Amino acid sequence: VLYVSFGSLAFVSGQQIEEIALGLEDSGFPFLWVTRPNMMYGQSPNFSIDFLERVKERAYFVDWAPQLDILAHTSVGGFFTHGGWNSTLEAITAGVPMLGWPYFSDQPVDCKCIEQGWKVGLSLHDDDNAPLKSLVSRNVIKTKVEELMTSNKFQDKVNEWSLSSIKASIKGGSSSNNFLSFVESLKSHP
């Protein structure tokens, strides 16, 4: 299953929503898509009855989802994301490869890390690694989703990073130790 969620702040045009929908359909993979009520510049996505009928056996649409629970589910094989920092870390910890589509702020850098740094997925960007300004076609989306969902290299890499993040978080790990050190420094300064 491909989990699709573009965060709480990204807005997408109606034409782009249609291209995403058709790209997901053409990929052939089952998907769970969080379609926020205001994600189309204040409007809700309005999918055609024909589209909904064609994908009804392998698509599920919700306006909110418990992201950590979904990413932790064993049936989730990929995450189509805006590449926000929290979503990126949650996916890595859960061991889920990502297809990043950055919009603004930290997202272009995060998506560059996803694809080029950590090699735990792919991203959609222009030649300068800037967010895309133009319409992305269903064919590009289909191709990227297929590559994400069928390539073992992303799953292998994200599993390595997931294990590292878990080790860092447990007692004696680097993140755990840094957190405890931070708490102690706060206690010593009234």
Positions of the model-derived regions?
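Catalytic core of nucleotide-sugar-dependent glycosyltransferases
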Residues: V1-P190
